[in-house]
Amino acid sequence: DKAVSECFYPDLKFKDLLQVVEGDKEQAEWMADDSRINLLSATGSTAMGKALAPRVSARMGKGLYELGGNNGMIVSRYANIDLAVRGIVFGAVGTAGQRCTTLRRLIVHESVYDELMSKLKSAYASLPVGDNFKEETLVGPLINQESADRMLSVLEQAKAKGYTVHGGEVVEGCTVRPAIVEATEQCDLIKTETFAPILYVLKYTDLEEAINIHNAVPQ
């Protein structure tokens, strides 16, 4: 904690206000149960939030939870396709899809679907994927082998459903190329967040349908 304080808060008057404690699940549960901690702010998975929130509320404590997300974007027939593609790539592949604000579902009007998909596939194919320590790299590895294996498993499930998968090849170790999945319907696989660079693309006819698709997820 001393190193963190000196690096990020060099002018902090009361040094003990900031403390760093290393730990895992057991330490998190202890903090959730400890009534001396008035506000618990936790960042992690939805499962983590579901586990911690009842423990904090049981002692009438306050909780602030930054959890997962299954974010969607609707591309209308009037969209600037080139601008849309830039925004999609930025939102879907940054930090290798490992952030709660990652774009995971793309809902595209049928009249611009083919044009957008052509440009999007081209953009994905040109992504610099690999070693994060190289300046030219845009997409680095997943956090561990378990995450990489989970991504590959989900892509295999998508293929088994008859969906078309672009990308998703293993580059090396935990590094996997971002994937685009063209889906015919929003099944449970798509409704469940995978913390990885997988972008599901769905087609829509009218705005009401697009909004219904967008909102039909639990997250």
Language-model features, listed with the residues they occupy:
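Short, contiguous strand/loop micro-motifs
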Residues: 14-15, 39, 141-142, 197-198
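PLP-dependent aminotransferase-like
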Residues: 1-26
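Short, conserved active-site loop motifs that form the nucleotide-linked donor/cofactor pocket
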Residues: 18, 162-163, 198-199
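ALDH superfamily catalytic-core signature
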Residues: 6, 33, 39, 47-185, ...
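Short acidic alpha-helix that forms the nucleotide-activated donor recognition element
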Residues: 29-35, 191-193, 212
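Conserved glycine-rich beta-strand-loop-beta hairpin in the small C-terminal domain of fold type I
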Residues: 137, 173-175, 192-198, 217-219
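Active-site phosphate-binding strand-loop segment of PLP-dependent enzymes
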Residues: 17-48
